């Protein structure tokens, strides 16, 4: 919603001593001849975001959708136009007219990338901060951790958040700009985030809270909110999955909601969705793309380990044994004390490392995985890597390395690239698992390429599908 219109609606709300939802929906009801009963609920304080979620009767939703189909526009544009005319404010000039996928009926925003977040933890905090921090960066500026400030015609500042879902009392019901700092989040602050106008909705718990994590967080009361409805009403393009490690059932449940809403997905955690043929087919059938699984960091333990393995390989040293031990103090490491939740994470990291050499390594000779939770490290992670190899003359050659990072900011830029790559795919009708982007950005993609080849594939994907240049035929490589 344009800021001017949002301010006018807020003023009208104050003058009528009502709430924003009732007034806006009442205006729409009068326009479409649909009776509307006031809810009496208080409105969320308007924030800096242009996103306003309206709760309205099903009959009014149907009328809006029918009018949108007839007018070949979006329900969002119809709402903005109706409110602007009623309140005497100049409305939206541009329309959201580009479709996505294989004609699945969703109409996409042309100039923005509308993003919803599942799991408002440290990673979500760093993502929201990152968009705020770099929203005004120059298009040709070098920004650490991003492939491009302007990626295929989408600037970092073109990302706008539309919805967020969590299950804890400290976050549900709060503005996203506040919730990212709520307990137990403990990452570093590098940007001042204003109120967003996005209220964190009550998500589905399933297996999202582990045995150890349940001792430090409290589940929010009440029913799970209508995830599909919220994603549709907000015109969300891309959903980012930041659920805790081990949330197998919760991830699959949310994936179904994403598919039903007709959104793209960036799966940042190690539950295998993008790499599984079943889910790849489901995303193709829905006409939407997915990038996954298990986000890489900018320079983290996995990419550093892969580089060391590649150096040994390229210089003719056989890797006989290797390990990677990780320590951290965030909620993810606390969750991973429950070893049963580690299976997919361990598989993901091990797969990423083993794929760098052209020979099989026995399971006993490779150990990769989280090791312990150290509370005072907070969102910092320490990783210890050791390689033992055999060089010329069967002489031993060993290497050790320690890396210290702030865990969540280390992947935020990678997620920003993934979001925009998904948007390019949506714009160009590309669906299913995106091979090149998944290989470059994720630890467990459908197909693993070496890092240089994967980056080349992503650059080719951007070149072919960019909206700022003449495009070659669309490709999902």
Positions of predicted regions on the chain:
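Short Lys/Arg-rich basic patches
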Residues: 1-3, 10-13, 34-56, 69
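Rossmann-fold dehydrogenase core element
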Residues: 282-295, 316, 320
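Surface-exposed, Lys/Arg-rich phosphate-binding patches that contact polyanionic backbones
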Residues: 2-22, 58-77, 81
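N-terminal glycine-/serine-/threonine-rich beta1-alpha1-beta2 phosphate-ribose binding loop
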Residues: 101-254, 342-347, 383, 392
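NAD(P)-dependent Rossmann-like dehydrogenase/reductase catalytic/cofactor-binding core
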Residues: 413-477
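Rossmann-fold NAD(P)-binding glycine/threonine-rich loop
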Residues: 244-260, 268-289
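Short, basic amphipathic alpha-helical segments that act as recognition/interaction helices
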Residues: 18-40, 73-95
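Active-site-lining helix/loop region of Rossmann-like oxidoreductase modules
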Residues: 118, 160, 171, 182-185, ...
């Amino acid at each position: 919603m344009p800021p001017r219109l949002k301010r006018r609606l807020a003023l009208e709300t104050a003058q009528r001593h009502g709430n924003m939802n009732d007034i806006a929906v009442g205006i729409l009801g009068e326009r479409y001849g649909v009776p509307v009963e006031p809810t009496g609920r208080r409105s969320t304080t308007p924030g800096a975001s242009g996103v306003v979620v309206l709760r309205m009767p099903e009959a009014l939703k149907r009328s809006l959708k029918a009018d949108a189909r007839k007018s070949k526009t979006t329900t969002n544009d119809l709402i903005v136009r109706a409110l602007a005319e009623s309140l005497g404010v100049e409305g939206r000039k541009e329309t959201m007219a580009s479709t996505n996928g294989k004609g699945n009926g969703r109409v996409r925003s042309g100039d923005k990338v509308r993003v919803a977040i599942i799991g408002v933890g440290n990673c979500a905090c760093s993502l929201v901060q990152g968009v705020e921090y770099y929203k005004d960066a120059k298009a040709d500026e070098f920004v650490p951790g991003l492939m491009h400030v302007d990626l295929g015609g989408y600037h970092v500042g073109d990302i706008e958040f539309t919805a967020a879902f969590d299950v804890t009392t400290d976050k549900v019901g709060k503005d996203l700009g506040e919730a990212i700092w709520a307990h137990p989040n403990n990452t570093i602050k590098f940007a001042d985030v204003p109120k967003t106008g996005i209220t964190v909705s009550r998500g589905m718990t399933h297996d999202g809270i582990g045995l150890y994590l349940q001792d430090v967080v409290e589940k929010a009361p009440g029913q799970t909110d209508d995830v599909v409805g919220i994603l549709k009403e907000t015109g969300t393009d891309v959903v980012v999955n930041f659920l805790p490690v081990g949330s197998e059932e919760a991830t699959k449940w949310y994936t179904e909601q994403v598919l039903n809403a007709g959104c793209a997905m960036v799966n940042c955690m190690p539950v295998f969705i993008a790499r599984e043929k079943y889910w790849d087919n489901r995303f193709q059938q829905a006409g939407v793309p997915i990038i996954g699984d298990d986000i890489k960091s900018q320079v983290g333990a996995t990419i550093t380990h892969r580089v060391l393995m590649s150096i040994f390989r390229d210089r003719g040293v056989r890797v006989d044994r290797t390990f990677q031990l990780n320590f951290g103090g965030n909620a993810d490491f606390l969750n991973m004390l429950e070893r049963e939740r580690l299976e997919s994470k361990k598989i993901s990291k091990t797969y990423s490392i083993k794929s760098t050499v052209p020979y099989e390594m026995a399971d006993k000779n490779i150990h990769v995985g989280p090791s312990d939770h150290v509370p005072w490290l907070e969102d910092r992670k320490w990783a210890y890597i050791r390689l033992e190899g055999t060089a010329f003359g069967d002489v031993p050659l060993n290497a050790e390395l320690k890396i210290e990072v702030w865990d969540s900011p280390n992947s935020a830029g990678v997620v920003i690239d993934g979001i925009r790559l998904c948007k390019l795919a949506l714009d160009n009708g590309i669906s299913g698992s995106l091979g090149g982007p998944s290989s470059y950005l994720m630890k467990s993609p459908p197909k693993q390429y070496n890092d240089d080849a994967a980056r080349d594939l992503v650059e080719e994907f951007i070149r072919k599908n960019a909206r700022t240049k003449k495009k070659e035929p669309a490709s999902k490589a």
